[in-house]
């Protein structure tokens, strides 16, 4: 499965790890993704989604209305 948040669209980024000796190594920075079961009240069903930690905060504040739009 791809490592992309369904709500925010966050995906892996690429950059450098820099050591104390200033050696650069390429690194892949992964988003903080979690697989969650979310209850959609409008549709009366559970949906399994991959969301980032930021998306979990958004859903706790605003509810799952934005998520319901994606699954209609």
Curated annotation (Swiss-Prot):
This is Large ribosomal subunit protein bL28. One of its GO terms (biological process) is translation. GO terms for molecular function: structural constituent of ribosome. Transmembrane segments: none annotated. The keyword Ribonucleoprotein applies. GO terms for cellular component: ribonucleoprotein complex; ribosome. Belongs to the bacterial ribosomal protein bL28 family. It holds the Pfam family Ribosomal_L28. SUPFAM superfamilies: L28p-like (SSF143800). The keyword Repressor does not apply. Keywords: Ribonucleoprotein, Ribosomal protein.
């Amino acid at each position: 499965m791809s490592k992309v948040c369904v709500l925010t669209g966050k995906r892996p980024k690429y950059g450098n790890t820099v050591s104390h000796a200033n050696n650069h190594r390429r690194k892949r920075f992964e988003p903080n993704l979690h697989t969650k079961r979310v209850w959609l009240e409008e549709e009366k069903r559970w949906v399994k989604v991959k969301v980032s930690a930021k998306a979990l905060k958004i859903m706790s504040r605003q509810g799952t209305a934005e998520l319901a739009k994606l699954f209609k």
